[in-house]
Amino acid sequence: FLHHLLENKRGWAVKAIQKLLDGKTGLVDTNGQDIFAGRFGYLRGRTDYADAVYRDILAKVLHAPTGGGLHLCDLRGHAGELGLKASGAEEYFGLIYIGDTTTFKKLVEADDSGIVIEEDAIADSLFEGINEPDTSVEILIGAKKFMEGWNSWRVSNMGLLNIGRKEGSEIIQLFGRGVRLRGLSFSLKR
């Protein structure tokens, strides 16, 4: 998805944003109404706004001067870390934090999607710096490594790979002993 978003072939991303704004996504509720119909009142009606939203996502979330493609960077010396960077960008915008990066990279290569795979031997750990105020990481994708326990004040959303696919308590464990969010009054409660 991120690669397609950055590429924006034939205006795909801008058109998708426009569909969201118009409430014509094809995602309907039980009454047959588009779930985004009537939403985004401020943004609706501005004819140029889909393109402006796309440019804003590129700049503020993906740290990309323009569109392009996705670079997946194996951070040498930092086991399990794959940095995500837009073509032409200097900073990483995301981190995939998983156990087996070699197998994951082989899957990406086999997919032949155009994602560039490279190595970065000098970058610091992105995961260790995730709570720093000047971190460039906006997107964190992970797997069972999150069940090991960590604290973060920056997480507002989590993407999980292969968690909770079988019966069991993985999701409960993840939030029971895994992630501690900032919480009320800096309590770091789960």
What are these regions (language model features)?
Residues 1-140, 165-166, 184-189:
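Conserved C-terminal RecA-like helicase domain
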Residues 147-148, 164-166:
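Solvent-exposed loop/turn segments at secondary-structure junctions
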Residues 141-156, 174-178:
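SF2 helicase motor core recognition
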Residues 158, 165-187:
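Conserved SF2 helicase motif VI
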Residues 6, 154, 163, 179-180:
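Residue-level marker of positions within ordered structural domains that often coincide
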